[in-house]
Curated annotation (Swiss-Prot):
This is Adenine phosphoribosyltransferase. The gene is apt. Pathway: Purine metabolism; AMP biosynthesis via salvage pathway; AMP from adenine: step 1/1. CDD domains: PRTases_typeI (cd06223). It holds the Pfam family Pribosyltran. It catalyses: AMP + diphosphate = 5-phospho-alpha-D-ribose 1-diphosphate + adenine. Belongs to the purine/pyrimidine phosphoribosyltransferase family.
């Protein structure tokens, strides 16, 4: 399926003042209610990564799970889940980070990756880059490396992609929104 940025953007709802005043939340749930838009999104990522040399896909809690698991299935790659604190049942590594909303912790099972593994990390969007930087730190602490950070949406004005690139992590997104774009 051919990528159509207009179709993609038309399936992303802008929700002003959520979860707090001044924030425009990018709601991707309409994207998952449109089989055509979802197929186009997954197919676009699959086409980009089908011949890429990485061993695992990482997915960020919670909306990153949606796209990361679909791409992992399509590419036949193991899926590593990065969860919010207290959600994983076995031994974990944890990493603190700042989000656009405040402070939080990210965890991953301690046996999820091995030295030499290479991880493509998915999230729904790149805002400040805090969660993806925390995931990258966890990947490295487990002896693996980050192949790339991928997202459906980039919010470049918040600087996350730049922060990731400054940390040596390449990024890819299907579309970008200005903060005031509706």
């Amino acid at each position: 399926m051919i990528f159509d940025e207009f179709t993609l953007k038309s399936q992303i709802r802008a929700v002003p003042d959520f979860p707090k005043p001044g924030v425009v939340f990018r709601d991707i749930t309409p994207l998952f209610q449109s089989p055509r838009a979802l197929r186009m999104t997954v197919d676009s990522f699959v086409q980009r990564y089908i011949e890429a040399d990485f061993s695992h896909i990482g997915a960020m809690d919670a909306r990153g799970f949606l796209i990361g698991s679909a791409v992992a299935y399509a590419l036949n790659k193991p899926l590593v889940l990065f969860r919010k604190q207290g959600k994983l049942p076995a031994d974990v590594l944890a990493e603190g980070y700042q989000t656009e909303y405040g402070e939080a912790f990210l965890e991953v099972h301690a046996d999820s990756l091995c030295e030499g593994d290479s991880v493509l990390i998915f999230d729904d969007l790149i805002a400040t880059g805090g969660t993806l930087l925390a995931a990258a730190s966890l990947v490295r602490r487990l002896g693996a490396r980050v192949f790339e950070a991928a997202a459906i949406i980039d919010l470049p004005e918040l600087g996350g992609s730049t922060r990731l690139q400054d940390a040596g992590i390449s990024t890819f997104s299907l579309t970008a929104f200005a903060l005031d774009e509706r």
